[in-house]
Amino acid sequence: MDSPSRLQEDIQAVRERDPAARTALEVFLTSPGVCALGWHRVANWLWRWEWFLVARIVSSLSRWFTGIEIHPGATLGRRLVIDHGMGVVIGETAVVGDDCLFYHGVTLGGKIQASRDETIGKRHPTLGNGVLVGAGAVILGPVTIGDGATVAALSVVLTDIPAGALALGIPAKVKKPPKAK
């Protein structure tokens, strides 16, 4: 899918999820989340072509303009909505599925490593499709959050969360088991 189509999808996703988003033009001109996703697409393309320094510069400019820090190596799905995005941090090896929703202050980070050798490989979370992450939530390490799960505001997730579950608390515990099929 080309970038203009992705941008249109991003804008439409914000309009569907944010009752304060009145028009596509307003979202395009004023949404830090949409802006950060656009910058990330450029940075990620540069990263994949191994223009690492330029990718990091683009990523830094995005953070400066939007307050949202997305590492250029992160993999983001379609129609991600970052609502009130100030302070959102998404690490290098994070993977985010389609149709996810993040509120402000969300961190997809790595755990503290004992040595540099431990920093090689997968260090950040993987989120399935349709995951909602509440304000101030922190998800650390190479954990998996299943499709349709919700991470409550201010929760700290250190273990895998099954699909459809609600994770709540510090450290987060599953409060609602996934629905039986």
List where the protein language model places each region:
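Residue-level signal for alpha-helical context at structural boundaries
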Residues: L25, L29, S60-L61, A94, ...
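Regulatory activation segment
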Residues: S115-H124
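Solvent-exposed, flexible loop/coil residues
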Residues: P32-G33, G38-R41, A74, L80, ...
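Terminal amphipathic alpha-helical/low-complexity segments used for targeting or macromolecular assembly
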Residues: M1-T66, K181
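Ubiquitous "structural anchor" signal
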Residues: R41, D99, D117-E118, P177
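Left-handed beta-helix
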Residues: T66, H71-P72, G77-R78, D83-E92, ...
